[in-house]
Regions:
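Conserved ABC ATPase "signature" region
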Residues: 103, 107, 114-131, 184
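Conserved ABC transporter NBD signature motif
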Residues: 66-79
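Conserved signature/switch motifs of ABC ATPase nucleotide-binding domains
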Residues: 135-138, 156
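Helix-to-loop junction immediately C-terminal to a conserved catalytic motif
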Residues: 59
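Short coil-to-helix segment of the ABC ATPase nucleotide-binding domain corresponding to the Q-loop/switch region
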Residues: 96-103
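Catalytic Walker B motif of ABC-type/P-loop ATPase nucleotide-binding domains
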Residues: 161-164
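The feature captures the beta-strand-to-loop junction immediately N-terminal to the Walker
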Residues: 44-46
Length: 259
C-alpha cells in the first residue's frame, strides 16, 4: 500500500464539482481538475461559464453542490490561511492611506505594531509603492490601486493567489506592465495562482497552463500547456512561439462560443 505524502498531494483538487443555484441554474457541472504547487493556471471562457464561481468554490466563499474541493489536502474552509483573493475592484478604503490599507488584515489580527509596519513596508517595496505609502487611494492611478490591492493580499504570506480579472479595468499598456510585475513576483515567491481573464493574450503570457471553460453548464472544454521560456518579458510577446500559442488558444476558445 502506497501512502500519499504531503508532497504528492495536489495543491488544489476539484473532483466532480458541480454548482447549482436555488433557481435551478447550473453554473458548473462535473469539473475535475488538479493544480500542482507552483502552477499558474488561467481560466478563459464565455461570460457565464463559471470562471469566477470556480474561484469562489476553491476559496470556500461558496459551497459546492456536488463533488469536493481540496486545497493542500484540506477543505477550503480549513485552508483559508493559505489563500488570498484579489478581485477586479481594488476595494481600498478611501479614508486610509496606502500603508494602512495594506496592513489592515494584520491590524484586524492584532499583529504587533513593529512586525506589522515591517511587513507592510516589505510588501510595498515588492510592488514598487514605497514612495506612495502615505497617500490616499484618490491620489493613485488605477495601476497603483491594483498594486496596493496585491500588496494587501501578500501581507498574509499566502501560498495560493486567486485572481479574478484583476487588470480588466486598466488600459492595455498598464495591464501589460502589471502582468510583467506579477510574473516577477510569482517567480520570486513561488505561489500557486488561479487567474481569470477574458484576454487570450494575457492568459498565454502569464500561465503555465490555460483552461478553457464552455458554458451552459460550465465545464472544462480544453487544457493547454504553455511552453514559453522563463523569465517572460515584453520581448516574449514578440516571439513566434507566443504568437502560435495565442493563435491556438484563440481557435479553441472560439469553438466553445455558441452561435
Amino acid at each position: 500500500m502506497v501512502t500519499e505524502t504531503k508532497e504528492s498531494i495536489p495543491e488544489i483538487a476539484l473532483e466532480g464539482v458541480s454548482k447549482r443555484y436555488r433557481n435551478a441554474a447550473v453554473a458548473l457541472e462535473g469539473i475535475s481538475l488538479t493544480v500542482d504547487r507552483g502552477e499558474f493556471v488561467t481560466f478563459l471562457g464565455p461570460s457565464g461559464c463559471g470562471k469566477s464561481t470556480l474561484l469562489k468554490l476553491v476559496s470556500g466563499l461558496s459551497p459546492v453542490s456536488e463533488g469536493r474541493v481540496r486545497v493542500n489536502g484540506m477543505t477550503p474552509e480549513n485552508a483559508r490561511d493559505l489563500i488570498s483573493f484579489i478581485f477586479q475592484d481594488a476595494t481600498l478604503l478611501p479614508w486610509r492611506t496606502v500603508e494602512h490599507n495594506v496592513g489592515l488584515g494584520m491590524e484586524l489580527e492584532h499583529a504587533a505594531g513593529a512586525a506589522r509596519k515591517e511587513r507592510v513596508a516589505r510588501m510595498l517595496d515588492l510592488v514598487s509603492l514605497s514612495h506612495v505609502a502615505k497617500r490616499y487611494p484618490r491620489q493613485l492611478s488605477g495601476g497603483m490601486k491594483m498594486r496596493a490591492s496585491i500588496a494587501r493580499a501578500l501581507v498574509s504570506r499566502p501560498r495560493i493567489l486567486l485572481m479574478d480579472e484583476p487588470f480588466a479595468a486598466l488600459d492595455e499598456m498598464t495591464r501589460d506592465r502589471l502582468n510583467e510585475e506579477l510574473l516577477r513576483l510569482y517567480e520570486e515567491q513561488k505561489w500557486t495562482v488561479l487567474f481569470v481573464t477574458h484576454s487570450v493574450a494575457e492568459a498565454v503570457f502569464l500561465s503555465t497552463r490555460v483552461v478553457i471553460l464552455a458554458a451552459h453548464p460550465g465545464r472544462v472544454a480544453h487544457e493547454i500547456k504553455v511552453d514559453l521560456p522563463w523569465p517572460r518579458t515584453a520581448k516574449t510577446r514578440e516571439s513566434k512561439a507566443y504568437e502560435e500559442q495565442v493563435t491556438q488558444a484563440s481557435r479553441l476558445l472560439r469553438g466553445v462560443y455558441q452561435p
